[in-house]
C-alpha cells in the first residue's frame, strides 16, 4: 500500500470552492479503487494551507486510476473546475509507505 500526502497552498478567499472540489474527489478516488483519508482544511493558524491523503495498493494501481480518471466525465470536470477557479495556488505530493508493527 502506498499513500499520497498532498499539501495545498490555497487562495484564502476561495476556501469554500476548494472544499467543494475536495468533496467531489473523495468518491472518485473510491470509485476507482483507492482509499481516500479525507481533506483537512484551515482552521487555526495559516489560513491558506490544506492537506489531503489517499492510498492505493501500488503505484501501478494509482497510475491505472489516473488513466481512468482522465476518461471519466466527473474527473475531467473536477480538473477543469480547479483550473478555472484558481483556488489552488500550488500543490505538493509526497508518496509514503506505511510502517507496520
Give the residues covered by each predicted segment.
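Short, structured motif recognition centered on aromatic/hydrophobic residues
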Residues: 2-7, 18, 29, 52-53
Amino acid at each position: 500500500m502506498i499513500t499520497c500526502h498532498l499539501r495545498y497552498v490555497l487562495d484564502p478567499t476561495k476556501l469554500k470552492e476548494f472544499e467543494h472540489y475536495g468533496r467531489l474527489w473523495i468518491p472518485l478516488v473510491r470509485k476507482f479503487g483507492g482509499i481516500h483519508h479525507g481533506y483537512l482544511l484551515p482552521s487555526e493558524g495559516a489560513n491558506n494551507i490544506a492537506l489531503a491523503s489517499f492510498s492505493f495498493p501500488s503505484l501501478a494501481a494509482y497510475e491505472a486510476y489516473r488513466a481512468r480518471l482522465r476518461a471519466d466525465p466527473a474527473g475531467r470536470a473536477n480538473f477543469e473546475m480547479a483550473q478555472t477557479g484558481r483556488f489552488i495556488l500550488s500543490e505538493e505530493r509526497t508518496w509514503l509507505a506505511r510502517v507496520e508493527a
